[in-house]
Amino acid sequence: MNITKAYVIFFLVVILTNSLSNSDVLASSDIYICVTVIETTKNDVCSTPCTIRYGTFECFHDCILEHYRDGNCINGRCCCK
């Protein structure tokens, strides 16, 4: 009986912890929200946030694919020009 009670309590704690945790934070390393912002300075468009996995090389590559001549991470965002 004590083992069953312990399993039920453990199960409820896991469910409660899972429901209270912020699932967006856990999945944020694989999900990128692309918001295009028109810049009025030297760069034409700044969009995807730069992270450890999405750095200068990836930014440059994506900008070239979108027919810009250059791209770099500036202030934490991928900026194409």
UniProtKB/Swiss-Prot annotation:
Keywords: Antimicrobial, Disulfide bond, Fungicide, Plant defense, Secreted, Signal. Disulfide bonds join C46-C80, C50-C73, C59-C78, C63-C79. Its main location: secreted. One of its GO terms (cellular component) is extracellular region. Transmembrane segments: none annotated. Residues 1-23 form the signal peptide. The keyword Disulfide bond applies. InterPro entries: Defensin-like_dom. It is found in: Secreted. GO terms for biological process: defense response to fungus; killing of cells of another organism. Belongs to the DEFL family. This is Putative defensin-like protein 56. It comes from Arabidopsis thaliana (Mouse-ear cress). The lineage of its organism: Eukaryota, Viridiplantae, Streptophyta, Embryophyta, Tracheophyta.
